[in-house]
Design a protein with these regions (language model features):
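Long, contiguous, secondary-structure-rich segments that constitute the structural scaffold
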Residues: 721-723, 727-775, 834, 839-854, ...
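Catalytic alpha/large subunits of respiratory electron-transfer oxidoreductases
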Residues: 93, 196, 225-700, 734, ...
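Short beta-alpha connecting loops at secondary-structure transitions
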Residues: 5, 66-72, 177-180, 460-468, ...
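A glycine-rich phosphate-binding loop feature that marks nucleotide/adenosyl-phosphate handling sites
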Residues: 101-102, 172, 210-218, 358-359, ...
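Short acidic-glycine loop/turn motifs at beta-strand connectors
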Residues: 53, 65, 276-281, 876
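Long, low-complexity segments enriched in small/aliphatic residues
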Residues: 582, 589-598, 615, 747-843
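Fe-S ferredoxin-like electron-transfer domains
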Residues: 46-47, 52-262
């Protein structure tokens, strides 16, 4: 720490700290319109002028130095601040009382008040541009835009979508999308970063317009008249009185606008933010404090909330009678469930029943679901959808390092010298994590290697893009491990001190020469050698992977090979290193963590451990089953075999997300009794005998656990719709109807029980998770957590990691003469899985209304296919009819079909092949043939972002503004400072 002096008072500061941050931390008020702590210095507004050692400088662009004398309110500084703000007001019409942004957080309004601006010295001049309304979620008003550049900085350097810029050389500058396109036809992915950081009302969510204020829902003509009245009064009264009126109106808003913290319900990143509501109307999503995401969101988290108030929400229980569903009371539904489950248990035993927890539900709900199965019914037949995607990654980590989760945090990924992404379309599946990689790669020199069979965004940004043959990643991973060991490039010190099994591991690598790997994978020896050298040279490496690794017949072994490589190179235990299996759902990590698994109770405590069972039996006052239960895959087999008679599924579209969907549906038809609990009448509900209406995330409390093991609280934003109940309450009521005596009144009581039974969560409670606080497991009883794992030792009895030998077998379903094409599948940015939630947001439906199959240009030319052509895909297990999109994202005989349709489901084509270690389906090993049908329209509308043309640049490029002939530096002797990069 160093000492500086601010307005005569000594203040401690970090050596590389910006003056503006020290001033704010000291409790001083200083205008700073363009500066945002999560964006860094932009230097466009000039309002943060201060005197440093007698010279005017921008506080946002000056780093502290020992002994520095800073004056924030000298005559020179104050005059410069006011002069700069006058320039801003010439670009912005103040009509705060009738503005939807008059909510206490408008930087322009607050700065006008701070500087006690009474009169506008430079007249406002509207810009000669129309308001751009072409994006379904937000609008841009150029005449209200102050050209601060925050939105550009956020788009170029935080989100790194590189869509926004400012045409500084134009006589009337404005923010541009793709250099001049409409927003709707640009490359904008609707992440919302720009709207979030806008300091005024130039960029606003459409859900706010006409809704936030008492006087904002006016006809345009009436609004214009009121603005004219305000402007007419201003010369005589000044802004003081006008602002007082607007602040009264703002204070009135405070009584009807609620701001409630929640955690995103979509992917596993764990974004958290405030939800602004007026009654049941969702005004906006406001990210600011999230420990995982900061200001960042994606289209789904920022705008994808149409499902909450959708007209087709389930609002009462349904019972099937005579082949039709009728509405029922809760008493009816619960009584029927209890009677039928009890009868089946009595007739065919507890193991003839099975339960599926939801990765969309909370930790507490997953815990109660497995408790219902085990302590009330008496079966370990409980699973969740991690079986479909993440179980192989968990196995790979359990084998090698001992914990089945990310070894560090998102911040570690940012710090890495080298990031490898294998089998993950990160920019679309985990977009906020992708922003951190893209930003570090663009701004900080981070190296990026991507391995995938599809050239998605991260592949195109990579320093090296590996395109191996399908299902061969294990081969080149093992080959690189061997190369590093053979060439003395492994981390010997780390291996000697922290790793067991090196000799046997070396022997297992015998077949994996670079030449053999090249032959199998199709990658060249030169490319593989270059990759190995980059890995050896990197001081800190992280590896990210997802379903492109796990959803193979050797998903567990390939995940193991990744962790082996990290051990060989010593890339555990240190910041900026580690293994990151990116979890798919918002709480797929938490569902597994909290016992919704056939072999483990909460905290991965084995069901066959007598000590573990005894502890739970004492607490629950029951005897527990002693043997491992059935997983998802085995449940379907057991139904067909006549052994499984009943299922209870919560929030899982199992009929179409499981592989070989036709086989799963035929199994469901054989069940004697089937309960489905969901928020919509899903495809799976069609097979149910009873449907129970659960509550989405905004209508309940609880916790989610993100991909980085981060446990976070979500708070109830809205009351449950109709007769819906929170899922934890439904499970409690079912258990009690079956004779249990559960007395939970709030999810916090469930978490307290979890902590009492589970060493991994011993210190987790709701007080420690208040607001935006979070904990990353394992959490000791005193509340201390571990953002970075293995700093003391690895999670084995001897404290050492284990190299685990794996061999390569090859894919199970390979193309042949009859089924000559390889079908890949996965997510889209704008939809989540089959779209049960996202299709209910109209703007997302407009942007991406249809499913499609991607076809390579060469295959399209060979088969006579154009974008829009209807094709029939036929596999050994089923067929679908779908329209084609011709794109170079795929090549050769590769096809890619996203999963965003319950009606044209890709899992009609996938088979029942599995990873034998986990029973995870080999979704990515599917062969099909293609039949060309008739022509049609492109399934992607012109307003889809994939047709845009980004305009990459280094931030806002403020130097171009400074070169304008009409630019005047406020004050005398302003020092133009090129901000030095922060020293590591």
């Amino acid at each position: 720490m160093i000492q500086i002096v601010i307005d005569g008072t000594a203040q401690l500061a970090h050596e590389d700290e910006l003056v503006v941050d020290v001033i704010v931390r000291a409790g001083k008020t200083i205008p700073h319109v363009c500066y945002h702590k999560q964006l860094g210095p932009i230097q466009t507004c000039d309002t943060c002028m201060v005197e440093v050692n007698g010279r005017l400088v921008r506080a946002c662009a000056t780093r502290v130095a020992a002994g520095m004398q800073v004056s924030t309110d000298s005559a020179k500084a104050s005059a410069a601040q006011t002069e700069a703000f006058d320039q801003i007001l010439s670009n912005h019409l103040l009509y705060c009382t009738v503005c939807d942004n008059n909510n206490g957080n408008c930087t322009v309004h607050n700065t006008t008040k701070m500087l006690a601006i009474e009169h506008q010295r430079i007249p406002f001049k509207p810009k000669p541009y129309e308001v751009d309304e072409t994006n379904p979620f937000y609008r841009y008003d150029p005449s209200q835009c102050i050209l601060c550049g925050r939105c550009v900085e956020a788009c170029q350097n935080v989100e790194v979508n590189e869509t926004l810029s400012i045409n500084w050389e134009d006589p009337n500058p404005r923010v541009l999308w793709d250099g001049g396109s409409t927003i709707g036809e640009s490359s904008c992915v609707s992440c919302g970063h720009c709207v979030t950081v806008c300091p005024c009302n130039a960029l606003m969510e459409k859900t706010m317009l006409g809704q936030a204020g008492f006087l904002t829902n006016l006809r345009k003509s009436t609004l214009s008249s009121m603005i004219d009245v305000v402007k007419g009064v201003e010369p005589e009264t000044g802004y003081g009185g006008i602002l007082q009126v607007s602040e009264i109106e703002h204070s009135m808003r405070e009584h009807r606008i609620r701001k409630t913290k929640t955690v995103c319900t979509y992917c596993g990143v764990g974004c958290s933010f405030d939800v602004w509501t007026k009654d049941r109307h969702i005004l906006k999503i406001a990210p600011e404090h999230g420990p995982a995401n900061g200001i960042s969101t994606c289209i789904k988290g920022k705008f994808g909330w149409g499902h909450i108030n959708s007209s087709d929400r389930l609002t009462s229980p349904l019972i099937r009678e005579n082949g039709e569903f009728r509405k029922a009371t809760w008493d009816e539904a619960l009584a029927l469930i209890a009677r039928r489950l009890s009868e089946i248990k009595s007739q065919t035993g507890p193991d003839s029943l099975a339960f599926i927890a939801s990765s969309k539900c909370t930790n507490e709900e997953s815990f109660l679901m497995q408790k219902l199965a085990r302590s009330v019914i008496g079966t370990n037949n409980i699973d969740n959808c991690s079986r479909y995607c993440q179980s192989p990654a968990t196995v790979g980590l359990f084998r090698t390092v001992g914990y089945g989760g990310d070894s560090g945090s998102i911040s570690d990924i940012e710090q890495a010298d080298l990031v490898m992404i294998i089998g993950s379309n990160t920019a679309e599946s985990h977009p906020v994590i992708a922003t951190r990689v893209k930003s570090s790669h663009k701004l900080n020199g981070q190296k990026l290697i991507v391995s995938d069979i599809r050239e998605h965004e991260m592949a195109r940004r990579a320093d090296i893009f590996l395109h191996p043959k399908p299902s061969t990643d294990l081969v080149w991973l093992n080959a690189i491990s061997r190369y590093l060991l053979d060439n003395e490039l492994a981390n010997k010190k780390f291996l000697n001190e922290w790793v067991n099994g090196l000799d046997e591991f070396r022997k297992s690598l015998g077949p994996f020469t670079m030449e053999a790997a090249a032959s199998i994978t199709g990658l060249s020896v030169e490319t593989l050698t270059t990759v190995a050298q980059m890995i050896a040279q990197a001081k800190r490496m992280c590896i990210l992977w997802a379903m492109g690794i796990t959803q193979h017949s050797q998903g567990s072994d390939s995940s193991t090979a990744i962790s082996n490589l990290l051990l060989v190179t010593g890339n555990y235990r240190r910041p900026g290193t580690g293994a990151y299996p990116l979890r798919g759902h918002n709480n797929v990590q938490g569902a597994s963590d909290h016992g919704a698994m056939p072999n483990d109770l909460a905290g991965y405590q084995s069901v066959d451990d007598p000590e573990v069972r005894a502890r739970h039996e004492a607490a629950w006052k029951v005897s527990l089953p002693t043997t491992k239960g059935l997983d998802n895959h085995q449940m379907v087999e057991a139904i067909h075999a006549g052994k499984l008679k009943s299922m209870y599924i919560i929030g899982e579209e199992m009929s179409i997300v499981d592989s070989n969907a036709n086989d799963v549906e035929s199994a469901f038809e054989k069940l004697d009794f089937f309960v489905v609990q969901d928020i919509f009448f899903s495809h799976t509900c069609r097979y149910a005998d009873v449907v129970l209406p659960g509550a989405p995330s905004l209508e309940k409390e609880g916790t989610f656990t993100s991909t980085e093991r981060r446990v976070q609280r979500l708070y109830q934003v809205l009351e449950p719709l109709g007769c819906c109940r929170p899922d934890w309450a439904i499970i409690r009521d079912v258990a009690n109807e079956l004779g249990a005596n559960w007395d939970y009144q709030h999810p916090s009581q469930v978490m307290d029980e979890i902590a009492s039974l589970t060493p991994m969560f011993a210190g987790v409670n709701y007080q420690r998770l208040e607001g935006y606080k979070s904990l990353q497991w394992p959490v000791a009883a005193d509340g201390s957590d571990e953002p970075l794992l293995y700093t003391k030792n690895f999670a084995f009895s001897d404290g050492k990691a284990r190299l685990y030998p794996v061999s390569w077998i090859g894919p199970v379903d390979q193309p042949d003469a009859e089924y000559d094409l390889h079908l890949n599948n996965g997510r889209l940015l704008e939809h989540f899985h089959e779209g049960n939630l996202t299709y209910r947001t109209e703007g997302i439906r407009q942007k991406t209304p249809n499913v499609f199959v991607e076809v390579s240009p060469e295959l399209a030319e060979d088969r006579g296919i154009q974008s829009g052509t209807w094709v029939q895909l036929i596999s050994r297990y089923g067929q679908v009819r779908v329209r084609a999109v011709v794109t170079d994202r795929v090549s050769g005989n590769e096809l890619y079909m996203p999963m965003n349709s319950p009606d044209i489901a890709v899992n009609r084509l996938t088979g029942s092949h599995i990873d034998p270690v986990t029973n995870t389906p080999a979704y990515k090993e599917s062969s099909v043939r293609l039949k060309v049908l008739e022509g049609g329209e492109n399934p992607l509308p012109r307003m889809n972002w994939r047709f845009g043309h980004p305009t990459p640049q280094q931030g806002v490029e403020v130097e171009r503004k400074w070169k304008r002939s009409d630019y005047r530096m406020p004050g005398d002797g302003l020092v133009q400072i090129q901000l030095a990069p922060r020293q590591e």
